[in-house]
């Protein structure tokens, strides 16, 4: 039975923290959340492991497993309900998925490898609702599993295309009861509780990350799944179940269409043929572009207030909503210039980009805060600078001190300067700011934040959603959005040969 889907995935355990930020912020769920927001977050899962039937289990907090390199398959298969032959077949499938991946070879090799392995495991899984108790002691891991060798990836090449669909999935083996089957390309936010949904934002970043490491087919699969769930008006719901349904009455978020187009634009920039994007995503991309043109066809040329990645209701427009709309329009322009038919000529799209950029500079500069004409800077400042777009006027100056304003004593970052002073760091925002810093030449900040993320993984090596004031991981682990951002940040460091 699915746990009660209380609102605010990334705010479930700290929703009350958002209340002091602005009188405009309203939390979903009302009195149901009174008192819950002030409970100290705890670690809900420590990582992932593939068990019998090829299903994916969350690891209990504190548990470790020695993995087959490049997979989330246990090196000792029997305690997890696998035979040696099943383990070998599933390992070939998992390694075939990542055979073409280009990952960094130096300082960040292990961090990037673990992020990719977890992201692929969370894409299209058959997911069990809770941890499995292995039939015997699990083989302890001595640290992060090494990246797969060239020999192991070469062996994976013999796996057929039909075997390379998903981490650990083998249709020849019966799955245990209770497994929730997600379709191919569906990126599950995290393996536990109210995170077992697909958020368009997370999926778009996952597609961009997979493209960045040379896994274009995986990236197209992620966007194809999103496209299958798109609303008729070209937008997206806040989140989806494994069947593509909406789990509650949470309103659709205006950023979804923008992130969908942005991710497609990243694939195009990474070398994906325009014909592939047209053939597989053409109509959904056109609907998304039409949606962005519609919501910016106003006197202000700005979208209406909407929930963004903070996932609280807003009556004042946030940078976290406005920026993805701009990024989506910019991507639509590039896609149209590459030959995709989006229902509007490239020139019209370019003119709307100019209008929206000018409107954002008029209304958010010079403070570039989270809210319109305010100084409450948050991680969305990264979205109005490289690597996302050309710098908007004055944003670079604000970005220079943004991380310091969001700093937590353990070394990570809060979602924004106005977040509750509870000492909790959030890994997706920290990873986003790391990527931003590295792209802007702020090398010390970027490497420091990446090193902090690397040092605050779980015992099994997974990236958690949060890190507490005492340095311990909290929330679910791994978190797909953080994994994607790690790949994007580390992929920006250097061009490397296939892993």
Q: What residue spans do the PLM features occupy?
A:
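Low-complexity, Ser/Thr/Pro/Gly-enriched N-terminal "stalk/linker" regions
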Residues: 2-4, 14, 18-144, 165-196, ...
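The feature captures the catalytic groove of carbohydrate-active enzymes
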Residues: 61, 67-69, 73, 182-184, ...
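Structural helix-adjacent loops and short alpha-helical linkers that scaffold large soluble proteins
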Residues: 102-109, 211-223, 267-286, 333-353, ...
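Extended ligand-binding clefts on enzyme/binding-domain cores
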Residues: 103, 251, 316-327, 338-431
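Long, well-ordered core segments of solenoidal/helical folds
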Residues: 112-127, 173-177, 215-237, 280-302, ...
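Active-site-adjacent structural elements in folded domains
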Residues: 188-194, 244-247, 306-316, 366-372, ...
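Aromatic-rich carbohydrate-recognition surfaces in CAZymes
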Residues: 196-296, 322, 477-495
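C-terminal capping/lid segments that line or modulate ligand- or cofactor-binding pockets
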Residues: 206, 250-267, 374-394, 429-499
């Amino acid at each position: 039975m699915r746990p009660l889907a209380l609102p605010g995935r990334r705010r479930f355990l700290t929703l009350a923290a958002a209340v002091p930020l602005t009188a405009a912020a309203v939390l979903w769920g009302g009195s149901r959340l009174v008192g819950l927001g002030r409970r100290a977050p705890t670690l809900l899962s420590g990582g992932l492991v593939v068990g019998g039937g090829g299903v994916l289990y969350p690891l209990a907090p504190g548990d470790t497993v020695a993995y087959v390199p490049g997979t989330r398959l246990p090196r000792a298969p029997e305690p997890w309900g696998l035979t040696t032959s099943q383990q070998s077949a599933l390992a070939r499938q998992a390694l075939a998925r990542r055979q073409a991946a280009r990952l960094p070879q130096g300082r960040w090799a292990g961090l990037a490898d673990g992020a990719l392995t977890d992201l692929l495991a969370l894409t299209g899984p058959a997911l069990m609702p809770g941890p499995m108790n292995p039939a015997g002691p699990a083989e302890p891991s001595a640290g992060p599993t090494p990246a797969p060798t060239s020999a192991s990836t070469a062996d994976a090449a013999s796996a057929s295309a039909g075997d390379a669909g998903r981490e650990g999935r083998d249709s020849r083996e019966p799955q245990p009861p209770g497994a929730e089957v997600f379709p191919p390309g569906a990126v599950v936010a995290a393996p536990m509780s109210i995170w077992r949904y697909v958020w368009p934002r997370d999926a778009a970043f996952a597609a961009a990350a997979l493209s960045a490491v040379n896994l274009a087919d995986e990236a197209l699969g992620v966007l194809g799944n999103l496209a299958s769930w798109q609303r008729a008006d070209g937008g997206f719901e806040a989140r989806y179940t494994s069947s593509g349904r909406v789990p509650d009455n949470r309103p659709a978020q205006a950023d979804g269409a923008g992130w969908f187009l942005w991710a497609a634009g990243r694939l195009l920039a990474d070398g994906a043929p325009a014909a592939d994007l047209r053939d597989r995503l053409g109509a959904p991309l056109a609907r998304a572009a039409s949606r962005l043109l519609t919501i910016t066809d106003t006197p202000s040329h700005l979208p209406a207030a909407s929930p963004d990645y903070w996932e609280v209701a807003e009556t004042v427009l946030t940078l976290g909503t406005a920026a993805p709309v701009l990024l989506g329009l910019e991507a639509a322009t590039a896609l149209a210039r590459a030959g995709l038919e989006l229902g509007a000529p490239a020139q019209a799209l370019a003119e709307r980009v100019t209008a929206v950029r000018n409107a954002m500079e008029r209304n958010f500069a010079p403070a570039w805060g989270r809210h319109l004409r305010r100084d409450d800077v948050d991680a969305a400042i990264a979205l109005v600078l490289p690597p996302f777009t050309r710098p908007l006027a004055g944003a670079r100056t604000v970005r220079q001190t943004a991380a310091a304003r969001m700093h937590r004593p353990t070394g990570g970052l809060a979602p924004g300067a106005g977040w509750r002073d509870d000492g909790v760091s959030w890994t997706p925002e920290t990873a986003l700011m790391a990527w931003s810093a590295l792209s802007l030449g702020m090398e010390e900040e970027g490497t420091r934040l990446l090193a902090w993320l690397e040092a605050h993984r779980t015992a099994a090596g997974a990236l958690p959603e949060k890190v507490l004031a005492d340095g311990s991981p909290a929330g679910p682990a791994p978190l797909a959005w953080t994994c994607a951002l790690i790949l994007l940040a580390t992929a920006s460091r250097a061009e490397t040969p296939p892993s």
